[in-house]
């Protein structure tokens, strides 16, 4: 799996164009719970704006056809694109399973941090911060050795000791 940098907001267009050329492309997205006008709304948000993940073996045709797509800025590690490591590939595939956005995760914070559902179950070690009031968690993601921060929506579960 390789990474293409594209213009922010053009991720879906770039993904569709890469699909139309016969290659697999992934854009991690999530349903984010946001407050707007006093109401909580579900909105679709790209998790890593400006990046499209190309899930195909690298060869000259792929390199040149993707580079020519409108909205593509460059391959990461230009000249000789570098593949993601296996852990990074697994994580991106979990985020983009069935080309569906990541739903809000069910999470319990006491006595220990625990993700109960969704593609992120078992990845508690990547959570950096949780914000109950905003219904959000912040996760650490590594892509080609660089750390990125991703925000996901969360439904916080109460434990029996928290109820009064």
Q: Where would I find each of the regions flagged by the language model?
A:
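Acidic-enriched and Gly/Ser
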Residues: 1-114, 126-127, 131-134, 138-164
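Short, charged beta-turn/beta-strand-edge "cap" motif at the junction between a beta-strand
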Residues: 117-121
């Amino acid at each position: 799996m390789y990474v293409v940098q594209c213009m922010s907001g053009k991720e879906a267009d770039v993904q569709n164009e890469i699909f139309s050329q016969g290659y697999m492309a992934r854009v991690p997205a999530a349903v984010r719970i946001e407050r707007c006008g006093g109401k909580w709304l579900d909105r679709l948000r790209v998790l890593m704006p400006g990046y499209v993940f190309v899930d195909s073996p690298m060869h000259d045709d792929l390199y040149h056809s993707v580079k020519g797509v409108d909205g593509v800025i460059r391959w990461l590690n230009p000249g000789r694109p570098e593949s993601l490591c296996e852990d990074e590939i697994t994580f991106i595939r979990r985020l983009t399973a069935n080309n569906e956005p990541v739903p809000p995760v069910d999470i319990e914070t006491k006595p220990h941090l625990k993700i109960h559902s969704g593609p992120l179950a078992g990845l508690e070690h990547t959570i950096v911060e949780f914000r109950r009031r905003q219904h959000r968690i912040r996760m650490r993601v590594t892509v080609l050795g660089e750390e990125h921060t991703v925000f996901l929506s969360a439904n916080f579960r109460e434990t029996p000791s928290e109820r009064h």
